[in-house]
């Protein structure tokens, strides 16, 4: 009888330990995934030409240029991936073309990198903030002269889900403009 009580007590002890372990793991997993990715942007002057975002004409081509600072805040307790940050050009809600991500430029003989050492994909540590200089460009000839009425900031998350939010509304695509830069950060996501 006494052995049966000891065996029964041991089984209860093991079961309660296992249940307690799984409850603790579930709670830790839930807590580490609590939080979000916040993305802020700020339009700035181009590092090479010292011009703000907009449309620019040369003798042979028209360009759409967007120099941008981006700040990514990870409020989760686990690392997060923000992959392939780009600008999408939309016409009446449909994606027409993505811009070209500029990886680097040469200044006084020194190569300076955009993004994360030339990459527009970012690994953000838990409860951290990352700030990056980005630059995007598109030639009018690359889009066949098509117009667009909206520019969206786009990226893929850890699960390969694509996210897109409006950054600018465009009234007259390909008409030369020199827009003002942002005075403060704007939350996009």
Please place each PLM-identified region on the residue numbering.
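Acidic, serine/threonine- and proline-rich intrinsically disordered appendage/tail regions
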Residues: 163-189
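Membrane-embedded hydrophobic alpha-helical segments
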Residues: 1-32
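Low-complexity, acidic Ser/Thr/Pro/Gly-rich terminal tails and inter-domain linkers that flank the onset
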Residues: 27-61
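Asparagine-centered strand-capping/turn motif at beta-strand->loop junctions
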Residues: 57, 70-79
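Short, solvent-exposed loop/turn segments enriched in Ser/Thr/Gly
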Residues: 62-69, 131, 149-150
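The feature marks short-to-medium sequence segments in extracytoplasmic or secretory-pathway proteins
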Residues: 77-123
């Amino acid at each position: 009888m006494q052995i049966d009580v000891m065996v029964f007590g041991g089984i209860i002890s093991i079961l309660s330990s296992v249940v307690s372990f799984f409850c603790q793991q579930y709670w830790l997993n839930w807590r580490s995934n609590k939080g979000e990715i916040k993305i802020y942007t700020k339009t700035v002057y181009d590092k090479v030409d010292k011009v703000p975002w907009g449309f620019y004409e040369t003798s042979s081509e028209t360009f759409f240029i967007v120099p941008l600072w981006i700040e990514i805040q990870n409020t989760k307790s686990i690392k997060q991936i923000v992959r392939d940050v780009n600008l999408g050009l939309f016409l009446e809600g449909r994606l027409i073309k993505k811009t070209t991500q500029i990886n680097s430029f040469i200044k006084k003989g020194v190569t300076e990198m955009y993004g994360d050492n030339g990459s527009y994909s970012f690994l953000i540590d838990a409860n951290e903030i990352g700030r990056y200089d980005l630059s995007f460009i598109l030639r009018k000839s690359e889009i066949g002269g098509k117009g667009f009425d909206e520019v969206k900031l786009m990226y893929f998350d850890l699960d390969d889900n694509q996210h897109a939010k409006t950054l600018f509304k465009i009234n007259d695509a390909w008409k030369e403009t020199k827009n003002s830069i942002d005075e403060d950060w704007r939350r996009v996501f």
